[in-house]
Amino acid sequence: MSHAIDELQAIIAELKTELEEPKATGGVATNSRLARDRIDRMSAEVVDSNPYSRLMALQRMNIVKDYERIRDKAVAIVGVGGVGSVTADMLTRCGIGKLILFDYDKVELANMNRLFFTPDQAGLSKVEAAAATLSFINPDVEIETHNYNITTVENFDRFLDTISQGGRIAGQPVDLVLSCVDNFEARMAINAACNERNLNWFESGVSENAVSGHIQFIRPGDTACFACAPPLVVAENIDEKTLKREGVCAASLPTTMGITAGFLVQNALKYLLNFGEVSDYLGYNALSDFFPKMTLKPNPQCDDRNCIVRQKEFQARPKPVVIEEKAVSEEPLHATNEWGIELVAEDAPESNPTPTEAPVVGEGLRLAYEAPERSSETSEETVTTAPADETSLEDLMAQMKSM
């Protein structure tokens, strides 16, 4: 009897291990799916086994000069939710060198209307689940996760140090920060950190009704920071929690979040690889398919003191020299016309000189042929008409036969 109980307990323990294994790997069953081997260098070879062939084709089409430089870039993504998770997915598939993920939330079944996460990952932290999935998609990408709230005083300093020293080269800052958070407090924390360390970053968001979104490229001192023109909630110091009621949540569409994430990653790639035009602000209205673009200038009276410092530094930079093109003169290149050449408009009426006028030629030239002068008197042509003949037709016929 005791032996049978021991066998049952062993079977139960084995089943528990099998159930826990997918959770420990972020929902990826390692015994059924094996990740590919790492690739040391990107190749443009067009074969089915090359995951980078279609990306490297951008070089052949003269879109990007050196696509492999993306492996030298480090990007920090704050917020791994509806927009942030898709953003991380896209950058991973593009072969980014390093991703640093920040989030303190967990995956819930309520998140399944969005992209990326799967139901078997419910209960895991978002950064843990994302890291497991992203590593399986592209093991060449270095992924670093931070499971904490960046808005607290202690964690803000940790966040500041990470983005300042978390680049591909040890001790160097990240190349770009992407804000994919859903609250103003976190946006203000990212804004303060990037202003303090003078880091370029993208702010992004989707409206509560899920039918509009936007991205904004913020360059400290050059464009408006998030505190230069804050939303009403931030400007009035209203506690955002008071606006939320129990049983009420924001709407969410995977389409709007996917479009916003696509805009975000597209402009991030253009900035990192230096091709195309990076949009300072790009919006999206799903109801009318409207895409507004604009540039927001910094506020000289911004409440963020570091923003004021960056504005002064930007204004002190030497302005780029603009070479003005010389105006094309409409005066004739040569004042003298030695050969007597004249230009006549195509639509001008043709004017033939009268026979008595001699054509004008240059000095030292003479005409090879001169037309003879015509007499002013016109000859009259004499037209001789036969007199009327009264001979009949029969007589004429008889005369012709006798000839």
UniProtKB/Swiss-Prot annotation:
Name the record gives this protein: Ubiquitin-like modifier-activating enzyme 5
Signal sequence, start to end: none
Residues at the catalytic site: 249
Disulfide bonds: none
UniProt xrefs under InterPro entries: D-isomer_DH_CS1, ThiF/MoeB/HesA, ThiF_NAD_FAD-bd, Ubiquitin-activating_enz
Keywords: ATP-binding, Metal-binding, Nucleotide-binding, Ubl conjugation pathway, Zinc
Native species: Drosophila yakuba (Fruit fly)
GO molecular function: ATP binding; metal ion binding; UFM1 activating enzyme activity
Domain of life of the organism encoding this protein: Eukaryota
Function: E1-like enzyme which activates UFM1.
Region named Disordered: 371-403
UniProt record, GO biological process: neuromuscular process; protein ufmylation
Residues given in the record as Zn(2+) binding sites: 225, 228, 302, 307
Family listed: Belongs to the ubiquitin-activating E1 family. UBA5 subfamily.
Example of a GO cellular component annotation carried by this entry: cytosol
Binding of ATP, residues: 82, 103, 126, 149, 183
